[in-house]
A protein has these predicted regions:
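Non-catalytic all-alpha helical scaffold/repeat segments
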Residues: 2-179
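ATP-binding glycine-rich phosphate-binding loop
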Residues: 177-178, 184-234
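ATP-binding glycine-rich loop module of kinase domains
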Residues: 223-252
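Active-site-adjacent loop/helix micro-motif of nuclease/hydrolase catalytic cores
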Residues: 243-252, 285-293, 365-372
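Conserved structural core of kinase catalytic domains
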Residues: 254-293
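C-lobe/activation-segment region of protein kinase-like
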Residues: 292, 298, 302-308, 316-398
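Conserved protein-kinase catalytic-loop position immediately C-terminal to the HRD catalytic Asp
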Residues: 313
């Protein structure tokens, strides 16, 4: 039996296609290394193995039998593992690009939007992958799930009006799928699908308010720790992510006031994902004065609120008054509806003021859930605050 016949027999007999492919590629690489080193003192079995592999190129073997291999990969729903194995040994990824349509069609057929989206992200970060993705955009838009490109719109839009129109049509006709992609990235709980319609409605309302199209949805960042995906829609910011801290938190005027902030919970009451819509702020802070940051932090601390995730990445300057708006109108949002425990004290902050954007780790000072971190300014600010309070107390007692 030839090596290729043995390979096909193994694929037929064993369910773990990716492991079989991995083993044969590794075998081929080992044989090449041995041949290069010209080892002659080998056992009879290895001599026979070398003989069976003479003239055999494993990469070409995989290419010839790619359809058979892919059928096995589809059965296991293991596309990402498969391409990772191929790219590990074939760094130029050419074998993947040669079979791009087959691989993407298989992932699309499986229908796991999170994996399909991750596959596209994976491809564009490989050598020449961005160009391959762009070249194949017409093919991708014709698949059953074109919405999986939602995080990569910036790569393909603006090239010509015809393509932009095609992208918009594909996305707008799969608006439910866009919401599903975002939520499935935040949670693997099957019950997250119960909130797809809710997020779809929220996105449509933002687009309407900002007079924008689906083509204008831009992923601008992956939040700190990769817990949130952040999208810009006009002057609004949409965050979709996994929960990190307590959802309910104390309110303060130094916190960016959201238009909407929702916790999506399963039937057991466990939070699967958090969604927040807020106004865009200026995060390009050129003069980063720690004293200004301490002043902000101290305002909260004086009111019994502790913010423990203090970094410049988590603040920004207001572009307008700290009041959310919709359709050009300022909106009053009940604190409880936005996950706050209370109304904040004082007047809304004006344009140019520094506010907190990331609210995952804001606690009441006596909270049993309070968490400190070894990074950022919070610990040093707390130490300074206690020393200053102790000095003030000494002054009063004199």
């Amino acid at each position: 039996m030839s090596l290729e016949e043995q390979f096909l027999t193994d694929l037929e007999q064993y369910p773990d296609t990716v492991s079989i492919v991995h083993s044969y590629i590794k075998l081929g690489e080992t044989m090449k290394a041995l041949k290069k080193e010209n080892y002659t003192d080998v056992c009879k079995e290895e001599q026979e193995l070398r003989k069976s592999m003479e003239g055999i190129n494993i990469e070409e073997l995989i290419e010839r039998n790619f359809d058979t291999i892919l059928n096995g990969v589809i059965r296991k729903k293991d596309i990402l593992s498969f391409v990772n194995v191929l790219s590990y040994y074939y760094k130029d990824c050419q074998i993947i690009y040669n079979n791009f349509e087959k691989i993407v069609s298989a992932a699309d057929k499986i229908g796991n939007l999170r994996d399909l989206r991750d596959l596209y992200i994976w491809i564009v970060h490989k050598p020449n992958g961005k160009e391959v993705f762009i070249e194949n955009i017409d093919f991708i838009l014709g698949l059953e799930h074109p919405e999986a490109i939602i995080d990569l719109i910036e790569l393909v839009k603006g090239r010509n009006k015809e393509l932009d129109a095609k992208i918009e049509k594909a996305l707008s006709s799969h608006s439910n799928g866009i919401a599903k992609v975002m939520l499935e990235r935040a949670s693997e709980d099957n019950q997250i699908d119960n909130y797809v319609d809710t997020l779809e409605f929220m996105i449509k309302e933002i687009l309407k308010s900002e007079n924008k199209n689906y083509l204008d949805i831009t992923r601008i960042a992956v939040g700190n720790g990769e817990f949130s995906f952040v999208y810009k829609i006009g002057d609004k910011i949409l965050k979709v992510g996994s929960p990190r801290g307590e959802f309910k938190m104390p309110n303060h005027r130094r916190i960016l006031q959201p238009l909407a902030r929702k916790a999506f919970r399963n039937r057991l009451g466990k939070t699967m994902a958090c969604v927040e819509i807020s106004e865009e702020v200026d995060t390009n802070i050129e003069q980063k004065d720690p004293e200004e940051l301490y002043k902000l932090w101290k305002e909260l601390r004086d009111e019994g609120v502790i913010w423990t995730d203090v970094t410049w990445e988590n603040v920004g300057r207001l572009k307008k008054k700290n009041i959310p708006s919709l359709n050009g109108e300022e909106m009053y949002v009940e604190p409880e509806a936005a996950g706050f425990k209370n109304k904040y004290k004082g007047k809304p902050l004006e344009k140019g003021e520094l506010v907190i954007l990331d609210t995952d780790f804001i606690f009441e000072e006596n909270s049993p859930y309070l968490r400190w971190f070894n990074f950022g300014y919070a610990k040093s600010f707390e130490d300074r605050y206690k020393k200053e309070n102790a000095l003030d107390k000494e002054e009063e007692e004199r």
